[in-house]
Amino acid sequence: MENPVGFDFETVCVSWTVRETSARRQQNAKIEVSLKEDFSEILWEKEGKDLNSAAEKLEFTRSAYTRYYVKVTVTNDKGETAVSEPAYFETGKMDDSWMGKWITTKKEDTFHPLFIKNFEVKKKPASARLYICGLGLFEAKLNGKKVGEEVLTPYYSNYHDEEQYLTFDVTEDIKNIDNHTEMQETAENQLAVSLGNGWYKGKF
Protein backbone atom coordinates (compact mmCIF):
# COMPACT_ATOMS: atom_id res chain seq x y z
CA MET A 1 0.00 0.00 0.00
CA GLU A 2 1.24 3.48 -0.80
CA ASN A 3 0.42 6.36 1.57
CA PRO A 4 -2.58 4.62 3.21
CA VAL A 5 -5.10 6.73 5.11
CA GLY A 6 -7.33 5.63 7.97
CA PHE A 7 -6.23 2.07 8.67
CA ASP A 8 -6.10 0.44 12.10
CA PHE A 9 -3.47 -2.24 11.60
CA GLU A 10 -1.98 -3.68 14.77
CA THR A 11 1.35 -4.06 12.97
CA VAL A 12 2.69 -1.51 10.50
CA CYS A 13 5.64 -2.36 8.25
CA VAL A 14 7.62 -0.38 5.71
CA SER A 15 9.31 -1.79 2.62
CA TRP A 16 11.70 -0.31 0.08
CA THR A 17 13.52 -1.06 -3.18
CA VAL A 18 16.73 0.55 -4.42
CA ARG A 19 16.80 1.09 -8.19
CA GLU A 20 19.43 2.15 -10.73
CA THR A 21 22.45 0.61 -9.05
CA SER A 22 24.82 -2.27 -9.81
CA ALA A 23 25.39 -2.97 -6.11
CA ARG A 24 24.35 -6.39 -4.87
CA ARG A 25 23.51 -5.93 -1.22
CA GLN A 26 22.46 -3.50 1.45
CA GLN A 27 25.19 -2.52 3.91
CA ASN A 28 23.06 -0.29 6.11
CA ALA A 29 19.54 1.08 6.28
CA LYS A 30 17.92 3.70 8.46
CA ILE A 31 14.20 4.29 8.91
CA GLU A 32 13.02 7.64 10.25
CA VAL A 33 9.49 8.52 11.34
CA SER A 34 8.30 12.06 11.98
CA LEU A 35 5.11 14.00 12.55
CA LYS A 36 6.54 16.73 10.30
CA GLU A 37 6.91 16.41 6.55
CA ASP A 38 10.32 18.08 6.65
CA PHE A 39 11.56 15.64 9.34
CA SER A 40 12.73 18.52 11.49
CA GLU A 41 11.78 16.43 14.51
CA ILE A 42 12.36 12.68 14.53
CA LEU A 43 9.76 10.72 16.45
CA TRP A 44 11.29 7.26 16.00
CA GLU A 45 14.18 5.73 14.08
CA LYS A 46 15.79 2.36 13.52
CA GLU A 47 19.12 1.61 11.85
CA GLY A 48 21.13 -1.48 11.01
CA LYS A 49 22.58 -3.76 8.37
CA ASP A 50 19.91 -6.43 8.67
CA LEU A 51 16.77 -4.33 8.35
CA ASN A 52 14.30 -6.22 6.17
CA SER A 53 13.61 -4.30 2.96
CA ALA A 54 10.54 -6.47 2.30
CA ALA A 55 8.79 -5.70 5.60
CA GLU A 56 10.42 -3.96 8.56
CA LYS A 57 8.17 -3.26 11.54
CA LEU A 58 7.62 0.28 12.80
CA GLU A 59 7.74 -0.40 16.52
CA PHE A 60 6.39 2.69 18.21
CA THR A 61 3.12 3.63 19.87
CA ARG A 62 0.72 5.26 17.43
CA SER A 63 -2.13 7.67 18.12
CA ALA A 64 -5.51 7.85 16.40
CA TYR A 65 -6.19 10.31 13.56
CA THR A 66 -2.46 10.98 13.11
CA ARG A 67 -0.34 11.24 9.97
CA TYR A 68 3.17 9.83 10.26
CA TYR A 69 5.85 10.56 7.68
CA VAL A 70 8.41 7.88 6.86
CA LYS A 71 11.81 8.13 5.16
CA VAL A 72 14.39 5.41 4.42
CA THR A 73 18.12 5.89 3.82
CA VAL A 74 20.06 2.95 2.33
CA THR A 75 23.81 2.49 1.85
CA ASN A 76 24.93 -0.35 -0.43
CA ASP A 77 28.11 -2.43 -0.66
CA LYS A 78 29.63 0.08 -3.07
CA GLY A 79 29.29 2.90 -0.59
CA GLU A 80 26.44 4.54 -2.48
CA THR A 81 23.65 6.12 -0.43
CA ALA A 82 20.05 6.58 -1.51
CA VAL A 83 17.38 8.52 0.37
CA SER A 84 13.71 7.87 -0.33
CA GLU A 85 11.08 10.48 -0.96
CA PRO A 86 8.95 11.00 2.15
CA ALA A 87 6.00 8.63 2.38
CA TYR A 88 3.23 8.67 4.96
CA PHE A 89 0.51 6.64 6.59
CA GLU A 90 -2.41 7.96 8.59
CA THR A 91 -4.08 6.11 11.44
CA GLY A 92 -7.84 5.76 11.71
CA LYS A 93 -10.17 5.82 14.69
CA MET A 94 -8.32 2.98 16.45
CA ASP A 95 -9.95 2.61 19.90
CA ASP A 96 -11.85 5.91 19.70
CA SER A 97 -15.58 5.33 20.15
CA TRP A 98 -18.11 6.19 17.46
CA MET A 99 -20.23 9.21 18.38
CA GLY A 100 -22.86 8.73 15.68
CA LYS A 101 -25.90 6.48 15.59
CA TRP A 102 -27.01 4.05 12.92
CA ILE A 103 -29.26 5.59 10.27
CA THR A 104 -31.81 3.32 8.64
CA THR A 105 -35.31 3.06 7.22
CA LYS A 106 -38.33 1.17 8.49
CA LYS A 107 -37.94 -2.59 8.63
CA GLU A 108 -40.73 -3.18 6.13
CA ASP A 109 -39.26 -0.80 3.51
CA THR A 110 -37.95 -2.61 0.43
CA PHE A 111 -36.37 0.28 -1.50
CA HIS A 112 -32.69 1.18 -1.46
CA PRO A 113 -32.44 4.36 0.62
CA LEU A 114 -30.58 7.57 -0.11
CA PHE A 115 -29.55 9.60 2.94
CA ILE A 116 -28.69 13.28 2.51
CA LYS A 117 -27.03 15.64 4.97
CA ASN A 118 -26.50 19.35 4.29
CA PHE A 119 -23.92 21.27 6.28
CA GLU A 120 -22.19 24.64 6.12
CA VAL A 121 -18.49 25.45 6.31
CA LYS A 122 -16.87 28.82 6.81
CA LYS A 123 -13.09 28.53 6.56
CA LYS A 124 -11.18 25.87 4.66
CA PRO A 125 -10.44 22.96 7.02
CA ALA A 126 -6.83 21.99 7.61
CA SER A 127 -7.94 18.42 6.98
CA ALA A 128 -11.27 16.66 6.63
CA ARG A 129 -11.97 12.94 6.74
CA LEU A 130 -15.10 10.93 6.10
CA TYR A 131 -15.23 7.87 8.35
CA ILE A 132 -18.12 5.77 7.10
CA CYS A 133 -19.56 2.34 7.86
CA GLY A 134 -22.51 0.72 6.12
CA LEU A 135 -24.29 -2.57 6.65
CA GLY A 136 -24.62 -3.78 3.11
CA LEU A 137 -23.11 -1.69 0.33
CA PHE A 138 -22.77 2.07 0.19
CA GLU A 139 -21.67 4.81 -2.16
CA ALA A 140 -21.02 8.30 -0.86
CA LYS A 141 -21.07 11.55 -2.81
CA LEU A 142 -19.92 14.94 -1.59
CA ASN A 143 -21.37 17.87 -3.51
CA GLY A 144 -22.32 15.52 -6.34
CA LYS A 145 -18.85 13.99 -6.68
CA LYS A 146 -18.28 10.32 -5.85
CA VAL A 147 -16.07 9.92 -2.79
CA GLY A 148 -13.15 7.60 -3.52
CA GLU A 149 -12.62 5.20 -6.40
CA GLU A 150 -13.74 2.03 -4.64
CA VAL A 151 -16.84 0.07 -5.60
CA LEU A 152 -18.96 -2.44 -3.66
CA THR A 153 -17.78 -0.95 -0.38
CA PRO A 154 -17.29 -1.82 2.42
CA TYR A 155 -16.56 -5.30 1.03
CA TYR A 156 -17.21 -8.50 2.95
CA SER A 157 -17.45 -8.56 6.75
CA ASN A 158 -18.30 -11.22 9.30
CA TYR A 159 -21.17 -9.20 10.72
CA HIS A 160 -21.31 -11.35 13.86
CA ASP A 161 -17.87 -10.10 14.88
CA GLU A 162 -17.12 -6.81 13.16
CA GLU A 163 -18.21 -4.07 10.81
CA GLN A 164 -15.66 -2.50 8.52
CA TYR A 165 -15.42 1.23 8.04
CA LEU A 166 -13.60 3.22 5.37
CA THR A 167 -11.73 6.50 5.59
CA PHE A 168 -11.69 9.10 2.83
CA ASP A 169 -9.70 12.32 2.60
CA VAL A 170 -12.28 14.93 1.53
CA THR A 171 -10.31 18.06 2.41
CA GLU A 172 -10.25 19.42 -1.14
CA ASP A 173 -13.87 18.51 -1.86
CA ILE A 174 -15.47 20.61 0.86
CA LYS A 175 -16.84 23.97 -0.22
CA ASN A 176 -15.85 26.91 1.96
CA ILE A 177 -15.83 30.69 1.69
CA ASP A 178 -12.25 30.59 0.37
CA ASN A 179 -13.12 28.47 -2.69
CA HIS A 180 -16.78 29.46 -3.12
CA THR A 181 -17.58 31.99 -5.83
CA GLU A 182 -20.66 33.50 -4.20
CA MET A 183 -20.22 36.24 -1.60
CA GLN A 184 -21.53 34.45 1.47
CA GLU A 185 -20.43 34.00 5.05
CA THR A 186 -20.70 30.22 4.74
CA ALA A 187 -20.66 27.66 1.93
CA GLU A 188 -23.22 24.87 1.85
CA ASN A 189 -22.16 21.28 1.31
CA GLN A 190 -24.19 18.15 0.71
CA LEU A 191 -23.23 14.60 1.66
CA ALA A 192 -25.35 11.88 0.03
CA VAL A 193 -25.06 8.18 0.83
CA SER A 194 -26.93 5.48 -1.10
CA LEU A 195 -27.29 1.98 0.36
CA GLY A 196 -27.77 -1.50 -1.04
CA ASN A 197 -28.29 -4.92 0.52
CA GLY A 198 -24.94 -6.43 -0.39
CA TRP A 199 -23.66 -9.32 1.69
CA TYR A 200 -25.51 -8.06 4.75
CA LYS A 201 -29.08 -8.86 3.76
CA GLY A 202 -30.07 -10.90 0.75
CA LYS A 203 -28.25 -11.99 -2.37
CA PHE A 204 -26.17 -9.94 -4.77
What are the roles of these predicted feature ranges?
Residues 45-46, 85-87, 106, 150:
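Short hydrophobic alpha-helix segments
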Residues 16, 50, 67-71, 90-95, ...:
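Accessory beta-strand-rich segments of carbohydrate-active enzymes
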Residues 17-22:
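Acidic, Ser/Thr
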Residues 24-67, 73, 77-83, 102-103:
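Recognizes extended acidic, P/S/T-rich segments that occur
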